[in-house]
Every structure is written in structure tokens, then in C-alpha cells.
Amino acid sequence: MENQEFLSSSAPSEVTDGQVSTEISTCSEVFQKPIVLRILDTHRELEESEDPEKHENPEEPEEVREQDQRDESEECDEPHESYEPHAPYAPHKPRDSYAPYELHGPHAAPKLLKAREPRQLRHTREPRKSREAKETELLPSAAVMISPSLITRAPPRPQLSFLGANPVSCDFVRKCFSSRKRTPNLSKPKKQWGTPDRKLFWGNQDPIRPVSQGALKAQLTKRLENLAQPKEVSCHYVPNRAQYYHSCGRESVIWEITPPALFRQPSKRIQRLSQPNGFKRQCLLNRPFSDNSARDSLRISDPSPRILQLSVAKGTDPNYHPSKKMQTKISLSTLSAIATPRIIELAHPRIKLEGLCYERQRSELPIRPVPPAAMIAKPSPRTIALAKSKSVHQDYLPDRDAHWPVSYATTHSKASPRIQELANPNKRAPVRIVYYDPDVFKTKPAALKAQCSQRIWELSQPLTR
């Protein structure tokens, strides 16, 4: 089956489009095989194809050889004819010079070819074309770049004596490494986008870096085996436990406490050392702030006598009367009073008949009845004047619309230097200087000696209620 596929793929077609399609389909089928199997199949077909040529064609006439040479030259020229854009190559007229070879028709060569079954002979010579098509698709470095998981030894290269003995094999090897047919196939545009040319599976992809034969045949030494073992910990190590024999896989284990350690009393020296150190006053003053932004020169100063005096809370004045309580006392007479029937009647809510305050007589009458005298009465001029709506002042301006045109002067105005100066924010001292001012609570000596007046002393007294 594999030979038939290679033969079908290598057979030349006279139609250019058909040839391109058959070459692409066969290339995709061939590339699906691993590169190792392709190399082995190629060498096997090389040996099988050369043996029948030696045994079956010992006395091949010169006419058949010349005809084969012409066929090979035509096959080599076919890739140039397959390109459609090259219009000047279509009328290739120099081939008319081969017409005199048709004079060999009257000779007995056709009978000899028919007697020797030339079609079967041509079929035996067909693998040479398939080998040319397949070997040009193989990579030149296929003998070196082999997956180590499939084979440990590289396939043997053809010997020089074998290549020198057979000139056909020499040409085959040259065509294999030159890859003349593979290059034009790769230069053609893709027929279908998005579909890969071949499927990737284990063994047919080439490694990034070729693996050397020495690395594949390397033997493990005793030194490497010893270095591969995990590092052991000495038996004199303090945590001498089973899980500490090897450095990997350590666990957090609580140490066992002996019973004498539980009932032992610490000495006075240990108790004194266990107490936290007491900071001296000078150490606290010299200690810098925990905040890195504060300067080291700033220190906490001792409070002045004035600050200590102000820190004492003020006492309550003896004449101070607190605010009146919200609770009101009710007298006993009010609690023991009895309501009269009239008060009880007035305490009830007003009962509405059908949701109205008054009874309705006719539907056209208003809800509240109007007395006849009010309906006959005539309003006075004062009542008529008050009934009219208040007129708008003569200087009244209605509300301006939300959209109004902006004047030309407003749109093209420029800020004066004075306005720009006023627009700048006020320059103030930095916050850090004001915040960390050590003299912020310092009082002037004159303010400490000042005496308040009689009026100020009276205003400072709380209100007497």
C-alpha cells in the first residue's frame, strides 16, 4: 500500500493544476509518517529497486536508454511547465528537434519491448521517480535529528563504496540533499488556509537540538549515582529523630518536656532578667520618634508650670444651679378630678355623615351650605380690591432663560495681572513646621502677670439661676 501511494504521488501529470493537487495531497500523507520510518522505507525501496534492474535489464538496448533519458529530462522540466504565470514557456519549440528519434519505429525495438513486457519493466523503474519525490521532501539532517524515545541508534548512512559503484545511487543522494522539488512546492501559495499540511504526533516532530550519540549511549557512573542521592544529616545533629535523617520532608514537632522541668522553680536571677527593662527619663527624651518623617532634632519637652496649671480641671461654682428637669409634677387634685358629661362629649371626635361635615339636600348645592344673607350681600369696594390679584411691580424683571447669548467682550476677555495675583492661593507656612513647633504653648511673661478687671471677673462668673 505504501509503495502504491508513493507511485501515485510520483507519477507526473500533464495538467498543471492536477499535478499541484496530487503533489500536495501525497506530501501531506507522507509527512504524517514519522521521519524515522520515512528514512527506513526510502533505503529499503532503494535496495529493492536496484536489484531487479540488475537482473532483468542486462541487455537493454540503447534506444530504450535514450528514451528513458528523454523521459527523465521531461520529468525534470515538468515543474517549470506547471507554473501558469510563465506564459513565454508555453510554446517551447526546441523540443521539435527530438522528432528524428521517431525514425526508430521500423526497427524491431518495439517488438523487443513488447516481448519483454516493457510496461512491467517501466513499472519496476517507477520507484526511481517516487524516490526522487520522497527524498526531496525529507530533511537533510534527518539522520541526526531522531527522537530518542523511538530509536536509540541512528540509521546507517549509505557507504561510499556502495555509492561509488552505482552512479544512479549517487544521483539519488545528490537529489535527496539538494531538495530541488521541495523548494518550488513550498514557494507555491496554499490552496486551503487554516488546515495544517500534516498532523503532529509522537515521533514525527524534530527536536529543537539534535541529541548526540554519546549522550544516548552514556552510562551512569557510581559517582553520579551517589550525587543523585539526598543529602544525609549527621547522627550527632541535635534533633535526632526519624524525620530529620534526611533534609527533605521536615515537619514541625513539639519537643517533649521532661517532668522535672515542669516542677522546677526559676532562680531570682532568672526572674530579674525576665522582667522588661525600665527606661530612664533621659533615655525617653533622647529616643527618636517612630515616624521616619519627623526630624531627630525634635524632642518632647517638659511641660511648663502654666501648662500644668491649665491642665487641672475647673471645679463647679457653689452658686451654680443646674438646668430644670423635664419631668413635671402633677398635683393630687388634678389626678383625683372627675370629668363632667359635657367634657366627655367634647372629647369625642366629630362624627361625619357619609364623609361630609354637613347633611346634603341636593346634588347641585355646595358641600358647605351658604346662608341666604351671604348670597344676597354685595361686596364693598375694599373687598373687591382685595379680591384682585396683586399686580407686578413696574421695575420687575422676569426670570432669565437658562440659555442666553454671551457677549463678545465676555468671550474675549483677558485676566489682568491683579486678577491673576488674587487668583493664586495664600502663601502659608508648611504644615510640618506649624505642627511640630515646640513653642506653640509658650506664654508671654506679661500675660502671666496680667490682672483681670472687675468687669471681666464678673463676666467670667457663671449665671445664677
Swiss-Prot record:
Stretches for region Disordered:
1-140
Q: Does the keyword Repeat apply?
A: yes
**The keyword Transferase belongs to this UniProt entry's keyword annotation:** no
Give start-end positions of Polar residues composition bias.
Answer: 1-29
Q: Which SMART domains match?
A: THEG (SM00705)
The entry's keywords: Repeat
Q: One Pfam family, please name it.
A: THEG
Q: Where are the THEG repeats?
A: 174-192, 214-233, 260-279, 297-316, 333-352, 373-392, 409-428, 446-465
The name this protein goes by in its record: Sperm microtubule associated protein 2-like
Tell me the gene name: SPMAP2L
